[in-house]
Amino acid sequence: MNKFLIIDGLNLVRRIYAAIPDETDMQSLTERVISACTKLLRVHRPTHVAIVWDGHEISWRKQLYPDYKKGRKPMPEPLAQGLVALQDHLTAMHIGSIYAAAEADDVIATLAIKTAKAQGEAIIVSTDKGFSQLNHRHISQWDHFNQQYLDIAALEQKLGVERSQFLDLMALAGDSGNKIPGIAGIGPKSAAELLKTFRSLPTLFSSLSNLGAKQAKKLAEGKEMARLSYKLAQLQTDLPLNINLKDFRVIDSPPEKTINQD
């Protein structure tokens, strides 16, 4: 069975970069990133590995909602200048790069879903909990910095909803980290309570007459914003990917069946 290790490039690199005392010390960054990737390969023993990078185009989410991710700090200049050399070092390690047009997240999600549907195993290396919406038994998420898999049961308990409701929760309450708005006046706790009762957004919005007047008014006025927020939060899993899986085979990995990436 194919085991595809899919690394969220900037999520890994920027976390490592933030811990380096001298922000111009690209040598230390390169050494630490290579060490991290070597450990990832040793721990997970994948048949295939790729590191996915964000691109420079304006994302479709930003075009749809200009405030999306507003206020995010730009990449530090030393890192921006040293990134190509770092990517070259990873290529020399036989860790191939995939370059997204805009956000890496949708490419990572597409790779994971395609792998899982082909009866392979996908391991996403990222601390971004947005990947938790990829509800498939052959997809897992690894936090390199805490050396553990994302605990979905613990996340469900923390958020107060089931995994199948994560997107509905973000549609109602928003996501401050990504500047996804949600509905004004609806916070995470009240959103979770609503989803416990009504289970899904369609059922909730068809049941406003069962709520108090004030809350029903908020929801009715925010319905379109909830739909927008859902769309912003939802990962695309069907992007056309012009890649060949054999290019990402781990050296010395035994032959496995390929997956269709069309």
From Swiss-Prot:
**Co-factor: note:** Binds 2 Mg(2+) per subunit. Only one magnesium ion has a direct interaction with the protein, the other interactions are indirect. Binds 1 K(+) per subunit. The potassium ion strongly increases the affinity for DNA.
| MF (Gene Ontology) | 5'-3' exonuclease activity; 5'-flap endonuclease activity; DNA binding; magnesium ion binding; potassium ion binding
Extract the InterPro entries matched here. 5-3_exonucl_a-hlix_arch_N, 5-3_exonuclease, 5-3_exonuclease_C_sf, DNA_polI_H3TH, FEN, HhH2, PIN-like_dom_sf, Xni
Q: Which UniProt keywords apply?
A: DNA-binding, Endonuclease, Hydrolase, Magnesium, Metal-binding, Nuclease, Potassium
Limits of the 5'-3' exonuclease domain: 162-257
Per the entry, which co-factors are needed? Mg(2+); K(+)
The superkingdom of the source organism is: Bacteria
Where, by residue number, does Mg(2+) bind?
Answer: D105
User: What task does this protein carry out?
Assistant: Has flap endonuclease activity. During DNA replication, flap endonucleases cleave the 5'-overhanging flap structure that is generated by displacement synthesis when DNA polymerase encounters the 5'-end of a downstream Okazaki fragment.
Name of the protein in question: Flap endonuclease Xni
GN (gene name) = xni
